[in-house]
Amino acid sequence: MTRAALLLALMLTGPLGAGELWLTGATVMDGSGSAPVAGLSIRISEGRIAEIRREAAPKPTGEGVVHLGGAYLLPGLVDAHAHIETPAAARRALLSGVTTARVLGDSYLKALGTRDLVRAGHAEGPELLVSAGHVRPRLGEPFLLSFPQFGRYLDQPLEGADQVAEVVRAVLARGADVIKVGASERAGLAGTDPRRPELSYEEMRAAVAEATKAGKFVAAHAHARAGANAAVRAGVRSIEHGTYLDDETLRLMKERGTFFVPTLAIMSPLGDPRGDSAEAIALQVRTHHMQKPLRAVVKKAKALGIVIAASTDGSYGDGDDTARVRVAHDVEELVACGFTPLEAITAATRDGARVLGVESRTGTVAVGLEADLLVVDRNPLLDTTALFEPMLVITDGRIVLDRIER
């Protein structure tokens, strides 16, 4: 929404209704890339943004009013690539300001169960869109224990479009919101080579066809040039990681409207010898040397106008190197790659929602959208570290974190 459109949306209102919440004195960054607008009030009703108005209008009073005193109000953050698997991790993500997350990969369907607990109101967390697995030639023990009908792949690889389509149908039937395919090998294991392709064009095309029938998108784990190029031609929604993308693939992504989720922030902890991965020397060295080419790719993608979304690739859990990564770290990484702070915040809000296909519901501050909101105490355009310190987090109109001084 443009600045002009935001101001046009300002309206007067009546008395405070039951179950309503007012946020007054807000400096609103609406997530669209427009400059902040000071002196606004937001009315929330039935979990949605019902009204945005000028502070000059009669101020509401009552228990359902939070006076922000000029603090900065943004859309809740979108983590476009996470590995949230437990209710505790989901709660940590939410309290960090993440109100929507796409979980790509799932061990023993734990993320799927956590998603269902959150949706049923039994656990606190962001809205989770879950892949319920990783479709690749070697499906792995966690996948096969969750889908024992594919036990024949315990000792042999998945191969061919028909086999891939069968697996994708099963994952969708289990309730997946998105399909994750392996276009290249993993980077996070010392014994794999992220430059080596995995699924073929025909296999990924079959995955896209099955997902499309179900109204779902496909995300491609892709570090390698060849694998990423095949994934884009196959019609995936997004390329994840993209460390070694070449110019041809980037141009193709721009032409096809393929989104890019580079997961920049995860590189630092995985390459940090002080972390839990310190014993895997090969992994440390690899991760450290992947940072430079990935940053170069991100700069090229930005210059081409490819839509880039922020993410963590993290677990928000306990006991692993990825747990401490936050979306705010990725905002800092994007700024280091030439984004303005406003562009980086847009990548963490509206553009993340676009990647997930939920931009009609969340990702911006606009009348009619879900009240997924984040408040910080200082201007994040001048100091992006403000995003590490949320003062207020609201999801679906409910306050889940409140550090506002009264």
At which residue positions do the language-model features occur?
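Bacterial N-terminal signal peptides
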Residues: 4-15
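Histidine-rich, glycine-flanked metal-binding segment
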Residues: 19-21, 28, 32-74
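Histidine-centered divalent metal-coordination motifs
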Residues: 25, 71, 77-85, 221, ...
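Active-site core of metal-dependent hydrolases
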Residues: 104, 183-295, 309, 314-318, ...
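His/Asp/Glu-enriched, well-ordered alpha-helical/loop segment
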Residues: 213, 292-379
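C-terminal cap of metal-dependent C-N hydrolases
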Residues: 348-350, 367-406
